[in-house]
Amino acid sequence: FRMDAEMLRDSALAAAGLLVEKIGGPPVKPYQPPGIWEEVAMPESNTKTYVPDKGEGLYRRSVYTFWKRASPPASLETFDATSREVVCSRRTRSNTPLQAFVTMNDPQWVEAARRLAERAVAAAPTSERRLDFLARETLARPLQAAEIKSLLGSAERVRAKYAFDAEAAASLVKVGESPADPALPAAELATWTVVASQFLNLDEFLNK
């Protein structure tokens, strides 16, 4: 079955090496699309405006996320997290295009893919070994020969794209608060960010 919303986010952060495992403390406010709270808040409300946290507050376990019942965290709600307005004994599990939109475009997921890519590049000098690292970190298994061939082809196509679009590469690796490794060329890091995102979007990663 597909993991619950909180488990999905935490798994992506853990694979990226971003998850803050500290226990306890006040609620935190991770990334959220701008303007959502303003649409539903009363003018005098003390939760009229959403201001994301900085630093480790962006990467704590989802259980610590500040929860406004009138406007639950958008990315978690997309994966069927409840509003908490009423008791829920069992969550539904929907399957919608918005869910892929989140895992491929939400800043939390894009940043996780980039940090996972940085780990892969630092861990291995060759494309094959980087793919093996990504597979073991996300799927907990080695890749088969056909999978390696397919992913190598994908990486080459992405690399060719970013070789001629430096602006797009630079824009991609800037997503998220954590800075990109300045020692890595933006085009190469962007290439492996896309490949890492492919791993994070596999059913094998999202379902346990």
Task: Show which residues each predicted segment covers.
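An acidic, gly/pro-interrupted, aromatic-rich
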Residues: 1-129, 178-208
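C-terminal structured "cap/appendage" subdomains that terminate the fold
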Residues: 120-193
